[in-house]
Each structure stands twice: as C-alpha cells, then as structure tokens.
C-alpha cells in the first residue's frame, strides 16, 4: 500500500482519513447546508478536494496540502449537487437540482458549457477515460452521453422513469463499458457505443442500489452496494455474481483502494467498513465516521509506479496514476492483474519533457522510457468507438479562446517538470489548479521522493506541441535515433516512423495551422516534430508481443503508410474547417492528440494481429510437415521386396521341414 495514502468521506462534514491505519487526519466543512455534503472528488495531484452539498448551495475547491483551506467557490445558488474532475483537473463537471450539467473552466472560474438535456434532477456525473465524453444520470432514469469535442448529446437511454439512476461509473479496462445502479435494485452494464445494455443483473438488490465501483486491477471484477445491506461482487466476463455479503446496516457509498484488494464502504449510520477481498467474511476495520449517513467516499490517486507498469513503459499514455487508466499486458492483449495501480491523468499521447542528455544517456533502457514518459495503457481487446464518432465532426462549433489561451492556460515554464537525481519532485505541477499561484508560498506542495529510474512526470496536454530550443530538439532527435538503433536494429522501421511523422506534419501544415507568417511557422513545425520523436520512442519501448521478434519491415512499412495517410487527411480536414489563421483551442489540440493516439493504437493492434496470425500459420505449416513426415516414414521405411523375400523363405523352410 502506498505510504500516506488517504481517503475522504462526506456526511454531515468532510473527514480525511489515513488509508492504512483508518485514523482521522483532518475534518472540515466549507458548506452551510444542513443536509450534508453529497459529492467529493480529489484532484489528480491529491492536493485539492472539490465538494458539493446536498442542497446545492455552492461548489467549493479546498486545498488539502496542509490544513484544509477553502480556496475557490463556484456555482453559488445554482443547486449543483454532484461533481467530477477530468483527468487533468482543468475542467470540472457538475450536475444538480436544476436539471443542468455544467462544465467549468477552473482557470477562468466560469462555466465553459451548460447542457440542459435532462428533464429531472441530475444525480451523478462522470468523465470517460479520455475526457471526450461525460455521462450523466437523473432521477427520471435517463442516462445521457455528452461529447465534449463535438458539443453533441446522445439520445437519452435507460430503463424508464421508475428507475432513478443513483450512480454511474466507467470500467477502467473496457473503455466502452458503463455501469449504473438504480432505485429498483437493478444493476446494468451499458455498451456506450450502441447505448444498449451489455447485461442486466435483475433484482440483485432487494432495495435501492446506492453505489457501483470497478476494480482498478482486475478487468472482470466490480462491486455494488445497496440499502438492502448487501455487498455484491460480479464477474463481467461470465456475467455472474461472484460473492454476496450482508452488512449490519444499509450501505450508501463505496470505493476501491488503488491496490485493488481493499474496499471502503460507508453506511447510513455514519460508519465506514474496510473490507479485504482476500478474506471477505467480515470487515477488517470499522470506524464511526459521521453523525449522519456517509454520502461519498473517495480515495486519493496512487503515485506508486510498480514494476509491471515500468515494463509496459511506452505503451500508451503518460503518468501518475488515474482511476480511468490501467496497464494492459502487451504479450496477450489481456490484463495484467498483479501489481497494477490506478494511473493518473494526462493526455492521450505520451508527454516528452526536456531532460539532461548525460543523465538520459546513462540510464540504459529506462532512459528511453523516461524520455517518452510512462504512458497510460488502453485495453486492446475493447477499443472504444467513442472518439471515432467525433472524428468527422465539424470544428466550427468550438469556441476560439484567443492567442493568450495557449500561453496563459498551459504555460511551459509553469508546467514543465525538471527531473534531477536524488531530488524531491512536487507531484502535479502541471495540474489544472495552477491558476492559484498565490498559494505556492503559503502552502508548500507535498513532496514525494522520485528516483532516477521511476520519475513521475507531469505536464499539461500542450507540452507535446510547445516549441523548444533548436539545439535541445536536435539532441533529443539524436538520442532517439541512437536508442532506436539499439532497440530495433531495423533502419526500415525508423524510416517508416519518420514517414508517419512527416505525413502528420504535412497534413497539419496544409490545414492552416500558422498564426503568423514567420515565427509561428517555425513554432508549429516544432510542435509536430516533438511528437515525431515521441512516437518513435514510444514504439521503440514497446516489448515484443508474445515473445516474438520484430514484425516484418515490409508489412510495417505498408501498414504505416496507409495509417499515416489516413491520419494526415483526418487532421487536415479537421483543422481546415477553422477560420483562416485562427489559433488552435485546447479542445482541438486534445482532439488531435486523441486521434493520433487511436491511430497508433490501431497500428499497434494491427501489428500484433499480423504477428499472431503469422505464428498461427507457422504452427499450421509445422503440423502439416510433421504429418507428411510421418506418412513418408511409414511409406518408405518398409521395403516391400524384402518382406516378400522373407515370406518366401519362411514358406520354403516349412516345406523342407515337412519333407526331410
């Protein structure tokens, strides 16, 4: 278990607990509501806590670096009762009694977008794994998916008005799997691509179900609780109930610890039970937490990187640890169930931060991993189609945030983390709450030791597009080329990856990326040269699939050319829809990042599939050769002439014995 990992619970007030000892660390209440606090959410760097009350008086952002201190108040009097942060903690989604879902920009402290598709009170909101969609549920039983990139909402789906949706959660492994619980005790797993039930667990709870939570380390496991005092564990593959426990009191809140082995469950009598999944007969610990019912429990994000996540290295997405992303075993396309932690937010492309060349060159394998970041992984056997649905949408609906938005919101000086051996690194410098600079001197950030081989890097989504000095760019390019030769040993692969990056660059430049005739052209070309190095380093670090060797360069070249051409066309079409010389908004850049990431994932999956097919074909050929060899041995190992001669001699011997 991570040292000093904490969790927060809400009831009549907010309390912060030590996760290992279950002892009280702090308590506070920034709200004036007599009905308690209904929703809480940690920021990605664990330094801030966002809260909303049951009466919807306001949304409060509090600093929890030292003593809890309210810093920011939003939505005063707007009756917002449920909150959720995106993976970068730059945007906050809320819903409440006014039937509205609001997206807040925490830098400007204003409503970024307001969605009024619900007909009744919004009870729960959540972002999906890549922050492109928001799922919200209401008292009327409706579930609506809102696209952040296209500003479109799906047709409401659900089970009817008699089934108020009480809680929604996305699976951490199957990106298109959404779980919901309702008042009539039905637990439903939804396929968000088709907006139809993947499976209904009917009448598993005899009273209203109150919470659902997916395991952060096991792709098959999730748990629900209800007012019938039941804790039920499920298997998503067999669609069966694994185990049912009965507690002493009605249960109201649940969350998994990042290690995946511990559950924290709140009850209507203010108690919190800690269960160990390895011995589920009774709770390991029980504490009296609140005077009223426990309405919400939220664990901090884990900042521990395990060996398995390091081995995965450059697989998909960057670093600390987030509920919405979990490592996937590249060898089998399945999930590596041991030692996986929640991975923290970042963008969809591995972020490259400038590092000293000498230290990077001296670290061997880890040097390339650190250069490319430690990316999040996505599930290769269930690729979500959610982002695909927004690829062809017109970007004209996006709000242009102006030139200053790129520099002010995502400052490269503020967001870039400097990695030094043996030094302490503040976790989450690139967090969305850096809009509070005056607090840095008052509340020093919580320090966490960072080793040279497992450095956790934080940056804003735009760091991959920020320009850097030409000398450093050339050094990064040379280092990447040398590392490439060491790990791949294939000049053809290098050429194919460069071809991909050049096509991306040409497609982007043809889409009117320039904001000024001279200097911005150079900056824009640098923005796309960095992802070229990054893509190459990311694919270099990918371990061999199923222990096989590097794919055939001819196959890789042909697949890469097709993928690159289609990707450049999509990017050019998307950006070309903007008005002339308009700067890219953060949403557009994130959309392009997601598009590139998904294309790389498709390419990686295609390579994996080709290698598996090749191995299967080789096995078939070997089997056919074995059978042919057996038949030839049986056919030619026996000499028919000799056998006939032996039989003739035997008959002759018998005849001679009979006569003489």
From Swiss-Prot:
Keyword Cytoplasm on entry: yes
Keyword Transmembrane helix: no
Phosphothreonine carried by residues: 382, 550
Stored SMART domains: WD40
WD repeats: 1-31, 32-71, 75-114, 117-156, 160-200, 204-244, 246-285, 289-332
UniProt KW keywords: Cell cycle, Cell division, Cytoplasm, Cytoskeleton, Mitosis, Phosphoprotein, Repeat, WD repeat
Region of interest: Disordered: 369-411, 507-532
Biological process according to GO: cell division; microtubule nucleation; mitotic cell cycle
GO cellular component: apical part of cell; centriole; centrosome; ciliary basal body; cytoplasm; cytosol; fibrillar center; nucleoplasm
PTM description: During mitosis, prior phosphorylation on Thr-550 by CDK1 promotes subsequent phosphorylation by PLK1 on Thr-382, Ser-397, Ser-426 and Ser-637. Phosphorylated NEDD1 can interact with gamma-tubulin for targeting the gamma-tubulin ring complex (gTuRC) to the centrosome, an important step for spindle formation.
Transmembrane segments: none
CDD domains reported for this sequence: WD40
Biased composition (Polar residues): 507-523
Compartmental location: Cytoplasm, Cytoskeleton, Microtubule organizing center, Centrosome
Cited function: Required for mitosis progression. Promotes the nucleation of microtubules from the spindle.
Name the UniProt record assigns to this protein: Protein NEDD1
The encoding gene: NEDD1
């Amino acid at each position: 278990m991570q040292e000093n990992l904490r969790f927060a619970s809400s009831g009549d007030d907010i309390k912060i607990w030590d996760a290992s000892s279950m002892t009280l660390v702090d308590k506070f209440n920034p709200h004036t509501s007599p009905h308690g606090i209904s929703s809480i959410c940690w920021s990605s760097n664990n330094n801030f806590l966002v809260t909303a009350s049951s009466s919807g008086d306001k949304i409060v952002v509090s600093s929890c670096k030292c003593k809890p201190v309210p810093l920011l108040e939003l939505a005063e009097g707007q009756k917002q009762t449920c909150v959720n942060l995106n993976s970068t903690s730059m945007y906050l989604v809320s819903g409440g009694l006014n039937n509205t879902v609001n997206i807040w920009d925490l830098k400007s402290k204003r409503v970024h977008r307001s969605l009024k598709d619900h007909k009744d009170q919004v009870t729960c909101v959540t972002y999906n794994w890549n922050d492109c969609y928001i799922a919200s549920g209401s008292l009327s039983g409706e579930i609506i998916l809102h696209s952040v990139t296209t500003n479109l909402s799906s047709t409401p789906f659900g089970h009817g008005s008699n089934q108020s949706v009480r809680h929604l959660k996305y699976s951490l492994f199957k990106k298109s799997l959404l779980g919901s619980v309702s008042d009539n005790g039905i637990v439903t797993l939804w396929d968000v691509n088709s907006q139809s039930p993947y499976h209904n667990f009917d009448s598993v709870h005899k009273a209203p179900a109150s919470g659902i939570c997916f395991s952060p380390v096991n792709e098959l496991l999730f748990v629900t609780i209800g007012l019938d005092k039941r804790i039920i564990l499920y298997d998503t593959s067999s669609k069966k109930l694994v185990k049912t426990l009965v507690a002493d009191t009605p249960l109201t809140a649940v969350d998994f610890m990042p290690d995946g082995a511990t559950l924290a469950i709140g009850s209507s009598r203010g108690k919190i039970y800690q269960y160990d999944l390895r011995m589920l007969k009774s709770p390991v610990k029980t504490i009296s937490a609140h005077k009223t019912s426990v309405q919400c429990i939220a664990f901090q994000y884990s900042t521990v990187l395990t060996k398995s996540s390091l081995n995965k290295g450059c697989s998909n997405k960057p670093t600390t640890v987030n509920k919405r992303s979990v490592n996937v075993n590249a060898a089998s396309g399945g999930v590596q169930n041991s030692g996986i932690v929640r991975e923290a937010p970042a963008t969809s492309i591995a972020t490259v931060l400038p590092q000293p060349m000498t230290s990077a060159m001296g670290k061997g394998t880890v040097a390339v991993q650190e250069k490319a970041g430690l990316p999040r992984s996505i599930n290769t056997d269930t690729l979500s189609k959610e982002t695909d649905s927004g690829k062809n949408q017109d970007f004209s609906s996006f709000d242009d945030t102006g030139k200053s938005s790129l520099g002010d919101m995502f400052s490269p000086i503020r967001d870039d983390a400097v990695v030094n051996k043996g030094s302490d690194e503040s976790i989450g410098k690139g967090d969305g709450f850096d809009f509070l600079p005056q607090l840095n001197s008052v509340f020093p950030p919580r320090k966490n030791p960072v080793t040279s081989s497992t450095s956790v890097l934080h940056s804003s989504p735009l760091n991959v597009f920020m320009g850097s000095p030409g000398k450093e760019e050339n050094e990064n390019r040379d280092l990447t080329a040398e590392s490439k030769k060491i790990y791949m040993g294939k000049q053809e692969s290098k050429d194919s990856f460069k071809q991909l990056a050049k096509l991306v660059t040409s497609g982007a430049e043809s889409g009117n990326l320039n904001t000024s005739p001279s200097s911005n052209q150079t900056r824009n070309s640098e923005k796309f040269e960095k992802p070229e190095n990054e893509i190459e380093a990311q694919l270099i670090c990918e371990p061999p699939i199923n222990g096989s060797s590097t794919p055939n360069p001819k196959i890789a070249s042909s697949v890469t050319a097709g993928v690159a051409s289609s990707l450049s066309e999509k990017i050019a079409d998307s950006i070309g829809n903007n008005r002339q010389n308009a700067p890219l908004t953060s949403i557009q850049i994130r959309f392009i990042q997601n598009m590139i990431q998904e294309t790389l994932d498709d390419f990686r999956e295609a390579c994996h599939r080709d290698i598996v097919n090749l191995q299967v074909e080789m096995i078939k050929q070997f089997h056919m050769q074995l059978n042919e060899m057996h038949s030839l041995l049986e056919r030619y190992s026996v000499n028919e002439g000799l056998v006939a001669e032996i039989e003739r001699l035997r008959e002759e011997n018998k005849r001679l014995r009979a006569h003489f």
